UniProtKB/Swiss-Prot annotation:
Organism: Bordetella petrii (strain ATCC BAA-461 / DSM 12804 / CCUG 43448)
Name the UniProt record assigns to this protein: Large ribosomal subunit protein bL34
One Gene Ontology cellular component annotation held by this UniProt entry: ribonucleoprotein complex
Cysteine disulfide partners in this protein: none
HAMAP family, per database record: Ribosomal_bL34
Keyword DNA repair tagged: no
Pfam families, A to Z: Ribosomal_L34 (PF00468)
Family: Belongs to the bacterial ribosomal protein bL34 family.
GO biological process: translation
PROSITE patterns xref list: RIBOSOMAL_L34 (PS00784)
Length: 44
């Protein structure tokens, strides 16, 4: 069985990047929650 995590910078940015988070209301909610919690990194 192959390993499920095959890293790719492109795919990572496209699915979890900052701009993707900003697109939807839910994504912005995620960023705001992370800001409120004081996360050092908001998105990938």
């Amino acid at each position: 069985m192959k390993r499920t995590y095959q890293p790719s910078v492109t795919r990572r940015k496209r699915t979890h990047g900052f701009r993707v988070r900003m697109k939807t209301r839910g994504g912005r909610a995620v960023l705001n929650a992370r800001r409120a919690k004081g996360r050092k990194r908001l998105a990938v």
